[in-house]
Regions:
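Flexible "cap/lid" loop of the alpha/beta hydrolase fold
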Residues: 1-37
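Active-site loop signature of alpha/beta-hydrolase-fold enzymes
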Residues: 9, 113, 143
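A general structural signal marking secondary-structure boundaries and capping sites
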Residues: 10, 29, 48-51, 163-167
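Short aromatic-enriched loop/helix-cap "lid" or pocket-rim segments at secondary-structure transitions
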Residues: 12-18, 117-119, 148
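Alpha/beta-hydrolase
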Residues: 35-112
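Alpha-helical elements of Rossmann-like donor-binding domains used by nucleotide-donor carbohydrate transfer enzymes
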Residues: 39, 43, 120, 124, ...
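Conserved loop-alpha-helix segment in the C-terminal half of the alpha/beta-hydrolase fold
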Residues: 98-140
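Catalytic active-site module of serine/aspartate enzymes centered on a nucleophile-bearing elbow/loop
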Residues: 129-178
């Protein structure tokens, strides 16, 4: 199982309850609108460490123009809400002690302000999983596969090489969540 800067931070890490999370996602959805394709692309360019034609095509593919000519997400609010609800119903912290395969967590180093929280969450995942590896990708934000594609690919390749002869029968499972 390979996690690209996701799936390890829990609701309690950000002190969020379901109502708060739903309110935040609704506010995000309403605010994530743009008056033109140009203003949307400028916004997106500021978010990434590197920009390319491929990244631009991906950015354009996730948006659409509504009847009022606003640039909005193709993903519906109900989809975002369902994802948030699922994280509260089935938190990943409950799942990791049941995972019977190696886990590689590649996590971002930017923004630096969130690194302490990410460190705590990563250590918790390592304790819960039977075979987990945590690696930080330097100078990369949440979209680390875009910010540092070669570094991410090399780390995944090396990790797969080490785990290619994985022996499921000898895996020792521990549950540190209780």
């Amino acid at each position: 199982l390979i996690l690209l800067d996701g799936g390890y931070i829990q609701n309690e890490d950000v002190a969020a309850d379901l109502a708060t999370d739903l309110k935040q996602v609704q506010e995000f959805y309403k605010s994530y609108q743009f008056s033109s394709w140009e203003s949307y692309l400028e916004h997106e360019k500021a978010y990434y460490q590197r920009w390319s034609d491929v990244v631009q095509r991906a950015a354009l593919a996730k948006m659409t123009e509504d009847e009022d000519k606003r640039i909005i997400s193709k993903t519906k609010l109900s989809t975002y809400e369902a994802a948030i609800k699922s994280l509260h119903i089935y938190p990943s912290k409950v799942i990791y002690s049941e995972v019977e395969c190696p886990i590689l967590l590649l996590r971002s180093s930017l923004p630096e302000a969130s690194n302490a929280m990410k460190e705590v969450a990563a250590k918790r995942l390592i304790r819960a999983a039977s075979d987990a590896t945590d690696q930080i990708i330097p100078n990369a934000g949440h979209n680390l596969h875009i910010d540092a594609p070669h570094e991410v690919a090399n780390r995944i390749k090396k990790w797969i090489e080490v785990h290619k002869n994985y022996d499921r029968e000898n895996l020792k499972r521990r549950n540190v969540w209780e």
